[in-house]
Amino acid sequence: MINEKSSSAIKSQINAEFYSAYLYLDFYNFYVEQGLDGFANWYQVQAQEERDHAMLMMQYMQNNDLKVTLEAIEKPNLKLSENMDPLREGLKHEKYVTGLIHNIYDAAYSAKDFRTMQFLDWFVKEQGEEETNANDLIKKMELFGSDPKSLYMLDNELAARTYAAPSLVL
């Protein structure tokens, strides 16, 4: 049986994952307005992934006969003016989400909620990948972003990213 503290934290995390999708759609809009469709694509795929994370958590709760109530999603309140802004904010946000996932894991560990710990293992790994990808993108932008030709090539690289459904099976 899932511990109450674990289930409460997962319910909050569902909202955080939907917020992440909403935030990344805001970044998507920013890059569309800048004419950087590849960067926009990268964040559109990110938004899809975050939505999937929320859905996986909802399914986990439902598979364990726990009720899920959706909460309001807060509007992102960021001032984006430079092409680097969404990248930096994205990395900052991924680090924040990693902390949230670790807090849920800690709650499950304290309660000896092994089922939830096993479920969260995938998310812990996923967050490591998310932070690495965000950091790598920042490094590329720092190297190439000021040169229009290089920015064009980086934008084309990001345009090639496609959505892949999560590997976690419940």
Question: Model features per residue range: what roles?
Answer:
Residues 1-170:
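Iron-associated oxidoreductase/ferritin-like identity signal
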